[in-house]
């Protein structure tokens, strides 16, 4: 049974800001070793590490209050904001530059490509088999006030849907498929 993406609770943007301020002078490794009862402790550490590491690659997204950055292991595989924007504009032009269009991202991952497509007017459906990433994609869609539909599964599970464009990141495909 798939996880209920709508009922997952994350720390608020206020909680994240407080954590970043309180632990500003701590290094990531020390924080990971520190025992803490906060159920979001590891996620908060990931946010600190993400802010330090990704602010150059994702300058716009790192500035959005409440936007959750993925774990660094996932973010390293993701497009930079500039690359994602280029791909989105290229795809948007290829389908005739409509003001609004339906897109499918079969390799949701960190969501930076999805975000870029949404900046070009796409109403996105995103598939992501990883529960944690799918939940973050859903949360971030709400933070960005996008009406994206997130499906925690592989794209092959889609039974219906008509899309103007389909995007698959080749670096995330398994065995080239």
State where each predicted segment sits.
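SAM-dependent transferase fold signal centered on methyltransferase-like domains
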Residues: 1-177
């Amino acid at each position: 049974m798939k996880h209920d993406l709508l009922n997952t609770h994350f720390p608020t943007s206020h909680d994240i800001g407080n954590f970043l301020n309180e632990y500003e002078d701590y290094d990531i490794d020390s924080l990971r070793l520190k025992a803490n009862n906060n159920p979001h402790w590891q996620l908060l550490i990931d946010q600190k590490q993400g802010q330090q590491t990704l602010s150059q690659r994702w300058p716009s997204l790192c500035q959005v209050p409440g936007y959750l950055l993925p774990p660094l292991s996932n973010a390293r595989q993701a497009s930079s904001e500039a690359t994602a924007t280029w791909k989105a504009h290229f795809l948007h032009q290829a389908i005739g530059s409509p003001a609004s269009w339906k897109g499918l991202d079969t390799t949701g991952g960190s969501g930076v490509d999805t975000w870029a497509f949404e900046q070009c007017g796409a109403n996105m459906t995103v598939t992501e088999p990883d529960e944690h990433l799918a939940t973050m994609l859903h949360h971030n869609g709400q933070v960005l006030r996008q009406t994206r539909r997130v499906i925690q599964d592989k794209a092959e599970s889609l039974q219906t849907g008509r899309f103007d464009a389909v995007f698959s990141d080749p670096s995330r495909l398994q065995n080239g498929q």
